[in-house]
C-alpha cells in the first residue's frame, strides 16, 4: 500500500483554523499542568522542599529545560516526523515497525505496553485536572474546601454524560477557549516577572545542575514532580492525524510554549516574593477580584483537557480492535462530517467508573500527582526506544539523542518509581490489567483460529464438489450470498453448514476477507482485490478488502463499490459457541477470561454495518 502524507501546504486561513483547533484538542492536558505541577514540586510527600531563591531557580530551570528537551526537541522537532500516512501515536509507530525483522516481537510488546500505560493516563488526567481546578476555590475562601470533592464529581459526571452526544458543536469553541486560557497564563505570569526580573536567571540550565549537585537526592525526587509539566506531550504525536504536524508546531512555538514559560517563570517569581503562595501558586497569581473567573476558566480548560484524552481513548481502542488486540466493541459515530468523532459505550462506562473511584480514593490533586508520573514517563521512554528503532540513524546521532533525551527520560521514570507506594501503583495496575486482557485475547484468538481451521473445508475441495452430480439434490437460490471469512484457502463454516445442513446453494457466492493493513487508511481505489474462483452455474468470488486501522469495516458499502448488484445480497455469519474442554471449576483463568470476552464482544452484524433482516447467523460449537 502506498503511503499518502497529508498535504502540508494549505491556505493561510485553513492553517489558522487547524492551529486553533489544535489548541483546543492537542494541548489541553499540557496546558492545564500549571494548575498543579509547581505546587506539587514544593510539597512532595516525604521530601518537602524549602522555599529559597536557589531552590526556586533550580526547580524552574528543571521545568523549562524538561519542556524544551522532551516536548520541543523530541516531539515537536523529531518524533512528529515519524508518521504513518500522516497519523501519529504509539500504535501508529508500532505499525510502521511491524516488519522490522528481529525487532518485530519486541515492537509488538512495547506497543502493547505503551497503549496500556496510556489508559492509565486517561483515567488519571480527568481526575487530577478537574480536582486541581476546583481546588482554586480554597484560594477564594478556605471555607470552600468542603465543596471541592462534590463539585469535582459533578463536573466529571457531566463530562461522561455528554459523551454520547459528541462534541461536534461545542468542540468548535474548544480552540478559542484554550487560546483564552493560554493568553491568561501568559498575562498572569508577566507582571510577576516584571516585579522580580531576576527569575529570568532560571532560563539558564546551570541552576538546574547546581540544584542536582547540591542536593542530588532531593533533585532526584523532584523529577517526579517536574514530569507533571510535560503530561500530554504524547498528545502532540497521537493527534497529528487530525491536524497535521505543521499546525501543531505553529501552535506550540507561537502560543503554548511561550505561555507555559511565562506562567512558570511568573509562579517562580511569586513564590520567591510570597512563600505562602506555594500552596497554590497558579491561583495566587491572579488578583483577588479575578480568582473566581479564573477558577471558572480553569474548570472549563480541564473539561476540554479531559475530553481530549477521552476521545484519544476511543481512537486508541478502535485501533487496538482493528489490530486484533481487543475484542469487537460497539462504535457509534457522533458526527456526519468528522469520521474521527466516535463514541464507544463500553469504554466510556469503564472510564467513568474508574475515574469516579480514583477521585473518591485519592481526593486531591496532590495525592494523585504521585500516581500520574509513571504512566507519563513509561510512555515517554517507550516512544523514544521505538523512535530510535524507526530512524535507525548513525551512531553519533543516536548517542546524542540518548544523552539529551534518553537519559533525562530514564531519570524521570526512575524518580517516579520511588512513588509506587504513594499512588504510582495505580497506572501500573491499570496497565497490567490491560496487558493481561490484550495478551489473553491474542492467545485465545490464535487457538480459535487453529481449531476452526480443522473444521473448515479446503477451498479446492469445495470447488471440486460444485461440479459433482450429487449437487443436484441441493436447493438452488437465484440470489447472491456473502460470507465474511478470515482466511483465503478454506471455506467459511457458515457456507459449509449452509450446503451440508440447510441444503442451500446460492447462484453467486461472495467470500470476503478483511486484510488489516498496518496503515491508518487505504485509498478506496486500492482496497479491493477480486478473484473469480468458479464460474457457471454457481459463481464463486473471493474478495480481499484491504483496510487501514482507522477505516470503517462497512461491508455493504465496500461491496457496493465493487459490484452494485450485490446490494441485495444475504449475509451469512459464522457464530462460534465456544466451550472449554475442561469443567468450569478446572478450566484455567485464561480460558474463562477469553470465553467471557468472546461471548460479550459486539456482534459482527453491527461491526460490519449489516442489516439484521438480510443477515443469517449459522452456529457451530467449538471446544477449546
From Swiss-Prot:
The domain of life is Bacteria
The record's listing under InterPro entries reads: K+_transporter, K_trans_C, K_trans_N, Kup
Signal peptide span: none
| Keyword Transmembrane helix attributed | yes
Report whether Chloroplast shows up as a keyword of the record: no
Location of the protein in the cell: Cell membrane
**Topology within the bilayer:** Multi-pass membrane protein
Show the catalytic activity: K(+)(in) + H(+)(in) = K(+)(out) + H(+)(out)
Q: Which UniProt keywords apply?
A: Cell membrane, Ion transport, Membrane, Potassium, Potassium transport, Symport, Transmembrane, Transmembrane helix, Transport
What's a single GO MF annotation on this record?
A: symporter activity
Query: Which family is it part of?
Result: Belongs to the HAK/KUP transporter (TC 2.A.72) family.
What is the recorded name of this protein? Probable potassium transport system protein Kup
